[in-house]
A protein has these predicted regions:
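Active-site His/acidic residue clusters
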Residues: 1-41, 45, 75
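Active-site-proximal beta-strand/loop segments in catalytic clefts of secreted hydrolases
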Residues: 13-18, 62-65, 98-100
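Membrane-interface soluble catalytic domains
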Residues: 29-30, 36, 40, 44-55, ...
C-alpha cells in the first residue's frame, strides 16, 4: 500500500538478522529463504502492480558489511567463534542489482577477482538517483567510483 501510494524514489528494506546462524543452521537457511522470497515478492509486486515504477526501478540487495577474515577469540554457547567487522575483509560484500539498463545475465567478480567494495555503494546509489556528482563533490564519501564505473 505504501509503495502504491507514494511511489518512492528510494526505499531501504532492512532484512534483520538474516545472517544469524550460530545456534541453528536450519533456521539460518529458513531466514535466507524468507529474505529471498520477500525480495522477489517486492520486485514482482512493483513490476506487476505499480506501472509508474515498473521498468523504472532499480533494486539492490546488499549486506551492511562483511566479516573479518580471521575470527576473534570469543566463542558462543555452541563453540562457534565470533567475527568482528574491522579488517579490510569486512568491506568485501556481495551485491545483486536489477533494473533498467542492467544486463540481467551479467555476473562479475568472485572471491578471487573482486570488483568493488562497500565504499562504492554510496556513489552507486547516488548515481541511480542522479546526484552522484553532488555526493562525490561533497567530500564526505570514501570513493568517487560507483559499481557502474567498475564494470
Amino acid at each position: 500500500e505504501v509503495m502504491q501510494r507514494f511511489k518512492p524514489t528510494l526505499t531501504v528494506i532492512y532484512l534483520s538478522n538474516v545472517d544469524g546462524c550460530h545456534s541453528n543452521f536450519t533456521n539460518y537457511l529458513g531466514s535466507l529463504h524468507r529474505a529471498d522470497h520477500g525480495v522477489g515478492h517486492i520486485w514482482d509486486y512493483i513490476q506487476n502492480n505499480i506501472p509508474q515504477m515498473a521498468n523504472n526501478t532499480t533494486m539492490m540487495v546488499i549486506p551492511e558489511h562483511g566479516r573479518n577474515l580471521v575470527s576473534n577469540n570469543i566463542e558462543d554457547g555452541n563453540a562457534f567463534s565470533g567475527y568482528d567487522h574491522s579488517d579490510a575483509n569486512s568491506r568485501r560484500i556481495f551485491s545483486s542489482i536489477v533494473g533498467p539498463g542492467i544486463d540481467g545475465n551479467l555476473s562479475i567478480g568472485n572471491e578471487n577477482n573482486q570488483v568493488g567494495d562497500i565504499v562504492n555503494l554510496t556513489p552507486t546509489i547516488a548515481e541511480i538517483l542522479g546526484c552522484k556528482d553532488d555526493v562525490v563533490n561533497s567530500g564526505l564519501v570514501a570513493s568517487s567510483k560507483s559499481l557502474f564505473d567498475l564494470i
